[in-house]
Amino acid sequence: SIEDKEKIASALDNLGVDYIEGGWPGANPTDTEFFQKKHNFKNSILTCFGMTKKSGRSAENDTGLSALMNSNTPAVCLVGKSWDFHVDVALGITNEENLENISESAKHFVKAKKEFMFDAEHFFDGYKANPKYALSCIKAAYDQGARWVILCDTNGGTLPHEVAQIVSEVTKVVPGKNLGIHAHNDTGNAVANSLAAVLSGVRQIQGTINGLGERCGNANLMSLIPTFFLKKDFSSQFEIGIKSKNIKNLTDCSRLLDEILNRKPNQHLPYVGAAAFSHKGGLHVSAVQKDPKTYEHINPEEVGNTRNIVVSDQSG
């Protein structure tokens, strides 16, 4: 509902994320109404989402792009194909037509002074199949002034070592300061792939609360955000827009989403799950009572979580 979307958006804004992708204006009544309302975010830039223009029409005459323009958001994110297999099978157009659709769509929003992002759908699969064409797709958006070009592992089958290798090659074509990563969790590597991409040069991560998303989900912001503050390899190299004091709100933010979805929270989520700092075995409990660092990689209070000692027949 509208009210639910506003609660989630408010929680993300209070957390301090840089961008909030509010949905697809024109795709359904809820998203359309959400963008018709006025939002006074303190920290986040509201972003609308859509797809590149259709073949056979100009950007100015594309109804989908018009709905995005009329949403009056400062930032716009469009998804477009970057795998030639998808261009042929899913869209049924030529590779050249797809490049034109990307280029003209990007030009349309950049000309209107929008902060433009291009989600290169299936980029990693596209790169593995036809690197020259995949790179030409992201270059088409970047050359027209895209602020961000996001490399999407849409099928979720790419592994961290592949992400690192491919991103390193991409940064030779598009600067890392203009690149982002959009990872799916189909191999359980969405967070790992996101971190690998950052270490290889990208500077935007797309993710969701609790990893909510299609199939196996997306990169979990509730795992990524604290990693950038609490793990030295990242805290010593990178700064993010979120203030360090706000990470204590991560657990509440995680549980708010589950409450809105009316589902039982996943107690085994890293950092924010109820079991993340829960100790049951006798050896573990004994050591934790002497010093929590024996079985805890961080202080749970740093992310708003709590330690839990479970009494059972395994406690000793």
Language model feature labels by segment:
Residues 45-50:
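A glycine-rich helix N-cap at a beta->alpha junction
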Residues 182-208:
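Small-aliphatic-rich amphipathic alpha-helix that forms the alpha element of a beta-alpha
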Residues 24-25, 95, 124-127, 156-160, ...:
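Hydrophobic alpha-helical scaffolding
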Residues 8-13, 226-228, 232-316:
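A mid-to-C-terminal "edge-of-domain" accessory segment
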Residues 6, 135, 188-191, 218:
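Glycine-rich phosphate-binding loop at the start of an alpha helix
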Residues 163, 216-223:
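Histidine/acidic-residue-rich catalytic or RNA/ligand-binding cores of hydrolases
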Residues 1-20, 35-37, 41, 54-179, ...:
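Alpha/beta enzyme core
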